[in-house]
Amino acid sequence: MGATLKHVAGRQGSTLARRLQKIRTACSRSYVVAGYIAGVSTPAAIAKAYKNEFGAGRTSDLDKPMPARPFMAMAIPDIVYAMRKSLPAFHVEQPEEFLASAGAVMANGIRESIDLGGFRPNAPYTLSQKRGDKPLVDSGEMQAEAAFQVRATA
């Protein structure tokens, strides 16, 4: 982030740099993770999310290898945009609330990426095994299991 801020020209860049430094200092005792989290999400949802994000080999004798559908990676630009909009509302006195808000934005961004799609279509065999034709959407488990957690730094 620091190298990027050096390239931001003008007063707006230095204002943003100061704002981000305040946030970094205020949040130095905690951080937020989002996605499919051990101890929060079910092991089945974590495995399913991993296979969908990165792809997998054959899932049955009838099926072809499962292609990667990087829904979490695709969510990042929208999450970054939403986080930039939330920076002005950050209060240094409430870093835990800010991190919880950031985590909610991140988890919602992952859910939206699943819903919006734009992925390679399901194979005929897969279509025969599920209710709809939308990749990544079947039971709603992956959307429901996307989570966030605010953690203390070690």
Question: Could you say what each language-model-derived stretch is?
Answer:
Residues 1-154:
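Short, Lys/Arg-rich flexible segments
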